[in-house]
Amino acid sequence: MSEVRVRFAPSPTGFLHIGGLRTALYNYLYAKRNNGKFLLRIEDTDRTRYVEGAIENLLEQLKWAGLDPDEGVVLDDEGNVTEVGECGPYIQSDRVKQGLYQKYIDELIEKGYAYYCFCSKERLDQVKAQQKADGLMPKYDGLCRGISIEDAKKRIANGEEYVIRLKLPENKEITFNDAIKGKITFNTNDMDDQVLIKSDGFPTYHFAVVVDDHLMGITHIVRGDEWISSTAKHVYLYQCFGWDVPEFVHLPVVLNKSGKKLSKRNDDVAVKDFRKKGYLPEAIDNYLALVGWSSEDNQEIMSMEELKHKFDFNRVSKSGGVFDTEKLNWINRHYIKEIENEKLASMLKPYLVEDGVISEDYPEYKLIEIASLFKEELDYMAEITEKVEFLFKDYEMDDDAKEFLNYEKLDELMNALKEEIESVDEIEKEFASGVMKKVQKKTGIKGKDLWMTTRAVVTGNVHGPDLDSIMVVLGKQEVLDRINKALNR
């Protein structure tokens, strides 16, 4: 068997969609499972939709997700777009500039598999409108199919605008096998004479993708199932050239919880948005692998190495995979819990600084306490702001906490705690861990009277995270201010 070579071939028309990342991931995992190569090609033949900076952004998101191409378009160490590999250029517009497609379109025309079409947009619109009115499938009516190459070249020399179309045979069945969907057959009577070269000289997706996949030695074409209806045209082009047809793998669509296709209008779909919220790349990879696929042992938490070992297309579902944010949160929460507190603190800091909760010079030891306090509660990093809000906003006691202000030994308890806190320069973890035992020993107060009364005064609530850590985060002066407020009630 020849080396497995797969490619992810996005268009630089905007942000990387979460469904696109899943397609890239499945390509990557299949390549790694089979000791093959994962290529990245940029398909930018539709220049009207090109977005400046989209290539850099796309490569950055893939790099973040750990999906580094073995070949094709990559980012160098300085963040510049470059290429690695022997089959370049890997950006289609650069391939056009080198004239790579010309010999192949000339071959199709010479063999009678393609023809020049001079129909105007206005005429094409009229034909399609009439077909719709007659209840027919809108497609090109073949007016220019009979124009000879000689006549066509004369018209081109006279300055007439043209495109080049694929000349499909009539009533021919084209069958191909899909690794997920099985055998699929289309009849050419239900297909259109696809434009292969546009009036601007650029190849269309349908022509370029076949030429590029062949020249780059792609063995498995792994893409979304929205391309199934176009695949018969691609198979016919392979047959016209006499090339081996690669294996096709059309992935089920990613759906929202309503069963509709994920859309940027109604759903969070941009990878950059998940990244900004603080989802971890290992969680995103783990979860996306499960959107339409399951491992044989039904394991759900899997590292990239485990995914590489277990992934195959025979367990990919035929129906759409539902993107369930709650399950993503559950998986992300698992990975957050695995992070060391010191590292997690540095990861949480940008969110707290950006939201104005803390300053850049906020003490590291307090950040570590915050990480320790809330790591079990976070679905994603950006949630940290609302989780810690009660520690930083203006101090206020809720009604349940106020009940403890009536405790008969409140003054004795608070004065004992105040005395201990005033004896240190700052509340650090070691002090906080032992201070309540000292207060208990000094006052004889224990249990609920000790702990819940102190919590009510220090936090303004009767429930919440570890009291020791809260005192560290609040700091000496803030804790004393809250104690004094209770004493001066």
UniProtKB/Swiss-Prot annotation:
NCBIfam families: gltX_bact (TIGR00464). It comes from Finegoldia magna (strain ATCC 29328 / DSM 20472 / WAL 2508). One of its GO terms (biological process) is glutamyl-tRNA aminoacylation. PROSITE patterns: AA_TRNA_LIGASE_I. A motif ('HIGH' region) lies at residues 10-20. Belongs to the class-I aminoacyl-tRNA synthetase family. Glutamate--tRNA ligase type 1 subfamily. Keywords: Aminoacyl-tRNA synthetase, ATP-binding, Cytoplasm, Ligase, Nucleotide-binding, Protein biosynthesis. Its EC number is 6.1.1.17. SUPFAM superfamilies: An anticodon-binding domain of class I aminoacyl-tRNA synthetases, Nucleotidylyl transferase. Pfam families: Anticodon_2, tRNA-synt_1c. It is found in: Cytoplasm. GO terms for molecular function: ATP binding; glutamate-tRNA ligase activity; tRNA binding; zinc ion binding. Catalyzes the attachment of glutamate to tRNA(Glu) in a two-step reaction: glutamate is first activated by ATP to form Glu-AMP and then transferred to the acceptor end of tRNA(Glu). ATP binds at K264. GO terms for cellular component: cytoplasm. Monomer. It catalyses: tRNA(Glu) + L-glutamate + ATP = L-glutamyl-tRNA(Glu) + AMP + diphosphate. This is Glutamate--tRNA ligase. A motif ('KMSKS' region) lies at residues 261-265.
